[in-house]
Amino acid sequence: KMKIGIITDVHSNIIALNKVLSEFEKIKIDKIICCGDIIGIGSKPEETVQELMKNKDKLIVVRGNHEQYLLKGLPKNVHDDKRTMSLEEIDNHEWTHSKLSENSKNFISQFKISNIIEIEGKKIYIVHYPNNENGLCKKHIKNPTIKQNEEMFSGIDADIFIYGHTHTTSINNKNNKWYIN
């Protein structure tokens, strides 16, 4: 049986990433699923991306909102009263983007918004967080019920749904469908 490690929302925390990757190595993980947000907030964006690149043969990664800001730009309304981000957050994103090499930016540009893979006969849907029709993250639900999970992922044909973004963990199972945050 294949061993899969799941990470998400690393946020440029190279120390935590190295600790997790060391544990993955000890237990001989075959694949690493990363649900995005490898950059942003933390102080080591370049080092974090480079460390993940060393594992790219094992890595299945999707784009989080922090990678989306790098690739598509920050929200346009940052200087008005309805802004979605504080000025400090904007400064952090700009600083993070300035610290990334072209090599790292090219690596990040390859991340899909979502991915469906099949492992051992199971379809696995991977996303940072389910998106609405505008491509933005739906309303955050920190500890979703099974009913909320079913609504979040309605219309997607998969056996296992893996996501992040909320910085919490949960596992729900119903009718042989697994929802892993």
How does the language model describe each region?
Residues 112-116, 168-169:
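Short, acidic/polar N-cap/turn motifs at the starts of alpha helices
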Residues 2-4, 116-125, 174-179:
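Beta-strand-turn-beta hairpins that frame and shape the catalytic cleft
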Residues 3-7, 12-109:
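Core catalytic region of metal-dependent phosphoesterases/phosphodiesterases
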Residues 83-87, 121-156:
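Active-site-proximal segments of metal-dependent phosphoesterases and phosphodiesterases across multiple
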Residues 41-42, 134, 170:
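Short, solvent-exposed loop/turn segments at secondary-structure junctions
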Residues 33, 60-62, 125, 160-162, ...:
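Hydrophobic/aromatic beta-strand patches that form the interior of the parallel beta-sheet core
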Residues 9-10, 126-131, 161-169:
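Histidine-centered catalytic micro-motifs
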Residues 143-181:
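Conserved beta-sheet core of the metallophosphoesterase superfamily
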